[in-house]
Amino acid sequence: MKFEAILFDCDGVLVDSEPITHGVLRQMLAERGWDMPIAECMRHFIGRTVRSQAALIAARTGRPLTDDWMTAFYARRDAELHARLQAIDGAPQAVRAAHAATGGRIACASGADRGKVVLQLRKTGLDAWFGPHVFSGHDLPRSKPAPDVYLAAARALGVAPARCLVIEDTVTGVQAGVAAGATVWGYCAQGADGGPLVEAGATRLFARMGQLPELWM
């Protein structure tokens, strides 16, 4: 295998969290007066932190985004994730195969807050494969689309970014991996439009996580 390390995004790649997270976000924004379909909510926020959209939220709701509101959002989101979250079909097998193929040089590098990432990996049993190599953009100077989280993951694994394969599902995530100097493949579920991922720099698209081990051999 030409890659020495494999770096996975979390939301939408390893765990099917996006509908849950954005369902809670949509509901809480509706309570503030910004009511929209779930598809519109995901279009505004997927691949981005809620705080990065503070100006948009303030403009649509007429109220600033506060720490208290974020704390309430995290609590409601995490309760729903704990109750309902499942791994993406094929993700456990892909992670296990990546661990074996790289001699354990794998990492989870997410733009989400660390508490969410850790909760999700534990809930799905994927935490055992990543060990200490779990990285959050919230812990770094810049989150995705900046490369910081992928650079931190590569550095911790002792692998040059150019020898890393990044698995992503959003434009901002692909941009982060490309900016880090890694090869980026885009996970694009059947029927989804992969064009934006390719435009952002993904060199390969695939539709099933379970097929991933066949592709890097």
Protein language model features and the residues they cover:
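N-terminal helical cap/lid subdomain that shapes the substrate entry/recognition surface
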Residues: 2-10, 14-100, 115
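Asp-based, Mg2+/Mn2+-dependent phosphohydrolase catalytic module
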Residues: 1-4, 96-97, 102-103, 113-217
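Conserved phosphate-coupling serine/threonine residues in phosphotransfer and NTP-handling enzymes
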Residues: 110
